[in-house]
């Protein structure tokens, strides 16, 4: 398959995938955890720990992310601290409750999705696993280049 065909298939497939992920997260989440709040918690868990970093990734204003962060702090899922290297920067971290909730949602959403994988053969499952590994590496590489 040509690179242009892969790129086109990616652009067509990923939005559909995100809709499914959003659906699984909604099924697995506590009522107060919207998909946007889930994404912020995921971002913080993987090391994006300032409002500006998260806002840039989501393509929204800092004010919009700040509201989500404030609600997550108020609910006890995130905590703020002053950066040890630059006192002007406020860093975000998951609390124990936030990490526990995020883990629970991910597990339940994965379980929801797993039932659909039954229609794939063992060979297709292996190919899908390798493709997802490649995508994960590609996303990490792109993110590193952006920083």
Residue spans of the language-model regions?
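Charged, amphipathic alpha-helical coiled-coil/dimerization segments
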Residues: 71-127
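Terminal interaction helix/tail motif
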Residues: 4, 8-10, 104-147
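A structural signal for well-ordered alpha-helices, especially hydrophobic packing surfaces
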Residues: 18-21, 48, 102, 136-139
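N-terminal helix-turn-helix DNA-binding core of bacterial DNA-binding proteins
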Residues: 23-64
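Regular, well-ordered alpha-helical segments
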Residues: 19, 23-26, 74, 118, ...
